[in-house]
């Protein structure tokens, strides 16, 4: 009798995606982050679902409903801590996943890469609307500052901002719709992730060497299911350490105060995973210019495949590109640090230099590094 997993219409799809899938034999731990992101998404959906059962999206009761979840709901404190820190783990995995894609040239699978960039933008939107829900000081002022950026768009900006707010400022209508968006977006992300996988399985996985691996493939199960399971254990260990020992480590103390439109916090900043983009936004002293730079900092990923000039796909054997890649990584860490600092010297100038270097590295230096490496590899006799 033929194995049911190979004949059943539904099981057959799962079999081709996770069991009998031919995978390169040499993919490293950097290829674990895709499955880790899937686990993060499932954790966030499950904890979020239970939180939504007790949360009320009303300006008068939102803050106290979160306090009620932590104090009165069975394991509510754990659900809230897992959900809040799960978002941080999600973004940590996302950044490492994108970094892996850039380092090993995975962006040359253009459809997979483009869906990935759309996924990144959608996850950022989901995290932003989610951060507003507890209705603390930083939730309210973060929402006010970021949605206000829409008013920088010529002609339609003010109308657009008021349309998003559902009034003349961030208020009850804004909170209610943000809760609705935050509930629906994870399912949209799940659908996009399936499309992302669909495109990936059209071409097969890339590998560290960047060489076509078709001559040496192994089945996904048991080799990579075991490898992924090890990754899951590490992820859950770090998440539980965060959620149980220092749940407020990555949060902002201002969010323990209920939202007050009459009292502005001394320093408005988003969660750590948005700080690099926030630093780029602030480094341009013009509202519209800042908004465009903010968008460009993410959308620049879409043109990375067009900037690939090297004869080799991966950076594994390209030391000049490797050096620039790690400078870019250090630069992003610098931007993250600057985004959390007050707007005063020397932070302003450091932020401006780091923002300029970010775009220069990607648009100019990476491009010429590939051409230079091609030239150096040419036989000189």
Swiss-Prot record:
It comes from Dasyurus spartacus (Bronze quoll). Heme b b562 binds at residues 83, 182. PANTHER family: CYTOCHROME B. Its main location: mitochondrion. Belongs to the cytochrome b family. GO terms for cellular component: mitochondrial inner membrane; respiratory chain complex III. GO terms for molecular function: metal ion binding; ubiquinol-cytochrome-c reductase activity. The cytochrome bc1 complex contains 11 subunits: 3 respiratory subunits (MT-CYB, CYC1 and UQCRFS1), 2 core proteins (UQCRC1 and UQCRC2) and 6 low-molecular weight proteins (UQCRH/QCR6, UQCRB/QCR7, UQCRQ/QCR8, UQCR10/QCR9, UQCR11/QCR10 and a cleavage product of UQCRFS1). This cytochrome bc1 complex then forms a dimer. This is Cytochrome b. GO terms for biological process: mitochondrial electron transport, ubiquinol to cytochrome c. It is found in: Mitochondrion inner membrane. Pfam families: Cytochrom_B_C, Cytochrome_B. A ubiquinone binds at residue 201.
């Amino acid at each position: 009798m033929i194995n049911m997993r190979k004949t059943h219409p539904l099981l057959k799809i799962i079999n081709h995606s996770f069991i009998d899938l031919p995978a390169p034999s040499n993919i490293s731990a950097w290829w674990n982050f895709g499955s880790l992101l899937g686990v993060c998404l499932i954790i966030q959906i499950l904890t979020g679902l239970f939180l939504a059962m007790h949360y009320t999206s009303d300006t008068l009761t939102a803050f106290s409903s979160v306090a009620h979840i932590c104090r009165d709901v069975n394991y509510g404190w754990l659900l809230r801590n897992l959900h809040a820190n799960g978002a941080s783990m999600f973004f940590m995995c996302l950044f490492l996943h994108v970094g892996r894609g850039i380092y090993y040239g995975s962006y040359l699978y253009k459809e997979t890469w483009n869906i990935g960039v759309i996924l990144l933008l959608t996850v950022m939107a989901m995290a932003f609307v989610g951060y507003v829900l507890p209705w603390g000081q930083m939730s309210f002022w973060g929402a006010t500052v970021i949605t206000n950026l829409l008013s920088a768009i010529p002609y339609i900006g003010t109308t657009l901002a008021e349309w998003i707010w559902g009034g003349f400022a961030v208020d009850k209508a804004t909170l209610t719709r943000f809760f609705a968006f935050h509930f629906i977006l994870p399912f949209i992300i799940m659908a996009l992730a399936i499309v992302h996988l669909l495109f990936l399985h059209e071409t097969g996985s890339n590998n560290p060497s960047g060489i076509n691996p078709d001559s040496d493939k192994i089945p996904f199960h048991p080799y990579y299911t075991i490898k992924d399971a090890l990754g899951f254990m590490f992820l859950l260990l770090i998440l539980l350490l965060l959620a149980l020992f220092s749940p407020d480590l990555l949060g902002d103390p201002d969010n323990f105060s209920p939202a007050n439109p009459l009292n502005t916090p001394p320093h408005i900043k988003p969660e750590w995973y948005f700080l690099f983009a926030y630093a780029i936004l602030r480094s341009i002293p013009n509202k519209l210019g800042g908004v465009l730079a903010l968008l460009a900092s993410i959308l620049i990923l879409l043109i990375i495949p067009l900037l690939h000039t090297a004869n080799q796909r991966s950076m594994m054997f390209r030391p000049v590109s490797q050096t620039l890649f790690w400078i870019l990584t250090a630069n992003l860490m610098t931007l993250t640090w600057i985004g959390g600092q007050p707007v005063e010297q020397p932070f302003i100038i450091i932020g401006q230099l780091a923002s300029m270097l970010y775009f220069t590295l990607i648009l100019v230096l990476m491009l010429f590094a590939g051409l230079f490496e091609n030239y150096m590899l040419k036989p000189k006799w």
